[in-house]
């Protein structure tokens, strides 16, 4: 049973997250042969306060 975790900044719509889960599931099924009903997708959203690049939080830009 494949498990996929997608980490991304918050702010996507529910429709975007639904489409992401559907397309990731389809891609994993196609490439691994796993049935779609056995594929688990976790979407973890992060606040810009909790994400930094080059030592700078995205919320500080």
Swiss-Prot record:
Give the residues annotated as active site. Answer: 2 (proton acceptor)
Q: Which Gene3D superfamilies match?
A: Macrophage Migration Inhibitory Factor
* Superkingdom to which the source organism belongs: Bacteria
Q: What class of enzyme is it?
A: isomerase
**Which EC numbers does the record give?**
5.3.2.-
A GO molecular function term, named singly, is: isomerase activity
Q: Which keywords does the record carry?
A: Isomerase
> What InterPro entries does the annotation carry?
4-OT, 4-OT-like_dom, Tautomerase/MIF_sf
Task: Identify the Pfam families for this entry.
Answer: Tautomerase
Protein family: Belongs to the 4-oxalocrotonate tautomerase family.
Q: What is this protein called?
A: Probable tautomerase BC_5378
Lineage of producing organism = Bacteria, Bacillati, Bacillota, Bacilli, Bacillales
């Amino acid at each position: 049973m494949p498990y996929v975790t997608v980490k991304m900044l918050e702010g996507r719509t529910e429709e975007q997250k639904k489409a992401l889960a559907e397309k990731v599931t389809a891609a994993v099924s196609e490439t691994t042969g796993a049935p779609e009903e056995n594929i688990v997708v976790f979407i973890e959203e992060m606040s810009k306060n909790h994400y930094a690049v080059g030592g700078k939080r995205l919320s500080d830009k």
